[in-house]
Amino acid sequence: EKMRNGLLADFSAPEVQESFRHCKTLLARFRTMSTYDADYRSVLEQLIPGIPATTVVVPPFHCDHGHGIRLGEHVYINAGCTFLDGACITVGDYTLIAPNVQIYTPHHPLDYRERRESKEYSYPVTIGKDCWIGGGAIILPGVTIGDRCIIGAGSVVTRDIPSDSLAAGNPCLLYTSPSPRDS
């Protein structure tokens, strides 16, 4: 509960470790699957409860818990993505996430003494509807990306991106809003 609310949480706590264990057991099966395997949907629905039938996650995929991931309708997550879901990760309808995208919600304390005690904060990440997140992009804790955004491949998104934006780079910079004919 502390994790989901941005409070300093102990990730070595038994309930957190049990959540990790459950997730890793499902991921061990999921990583070896194809989207065409008979059990694919069943394992995916156990991993990410409430996932819409129209949403696809291509293995291999990595997450910490799975139950912190909220995906909209017609979302497509390509192979090799990592979603560290200590806090909620929300992805809007019709969003495309290219291969090897990493979304992080955990943020370790700056004080080394707290890091030694297996403590961390987690801040939610929200990606709007109709977005395209380019391959290898990294989205840091607490970021919100508005609707209809394009994030360039390899970008490191450190701050919020407003709707209808094209942003890219390391750190990710806002370049333009898409033209009306591209909408």
Segments predicted by a language model, with ranges:
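Conserved small/polar residues in nucleotide/adenosyl-binding loops
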Residues: 175-182
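Histidine-centered active-site/metal-ligand motif
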Residues: 108
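SAM-dependent methyltransferase catalytic-core segment centered on the flexible catalytic loop
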Residues: 115-118
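Walker B catalytic motif
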Residues: 171
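Extended, small-residue-rich solenoid/repeat segments and analogous flexible loops
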Residues: 8-9, 14-68
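Short, hydrophobic secondary-structure boundary micro-motifs
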Residues: 11, 112-113
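Left-handed beta-helix
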Residues: 53, 58-59, 64-67, 72-73, ...
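Charged, compositionally biased N-terminal leader segments and the immediate start
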Residues: 1-5
